[in-house]
């Protein structure tokens, strides 16, 4: 009856979760080919924030972003960058728990690079945690696969960019991404 149906559901859900873990792992080892397009950073950030807005609202977390109309477009894979931002937001929401702020800013770092900064008012991290966060399987949260940030780093590096995390216990965290304006040309030159 009901109990075996519930069990079947739990098993299906678990199988689904494991499949996801495996596919994330495979992605980590061999990230898929990047599908380069002209990306409007403002639109990308707005879209990615929309995807988590309900979840954030239900936890009392404010999402702050002021678009910069003068920001240059970049050559990048929008789906992958979306994945990067979502991982960072979900990470931030987990660090905050309830009632806090996630702030996103975008600017031109220099002529060749744009900079996206995601700041949260969460619980922060120790030096040990900071050093380990981009390592696969490292997670400070129960029930997390701990692959999110390793995947994030992989995608950013694949774009020829860099990511840095800064944090102190009790003082939130700051994730800074630098992305080349024209990553595709660099990739072509490397072939």
Question: What is each PLM-predicted segment?
Answer:
Residues 12, 35-49:
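A conserved beta-strand-to-alpha-helix junction within the catalytic ATP-binding
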Residues 41, 124-132:
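Short helix N-cap motif at coil->helix boundaries in the Bergerat
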Residues 32-34, 73-76, 140:
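Conserved micro-motifs of the catalytic ATP-binding
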Residues 99-112:
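Short beta-strand/loop element within the Bergerat-fold HATPase_c
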Residues 37, 57, 62-72, 109:
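Conserved catalytic submotifs in the C-terminal HATPase_c
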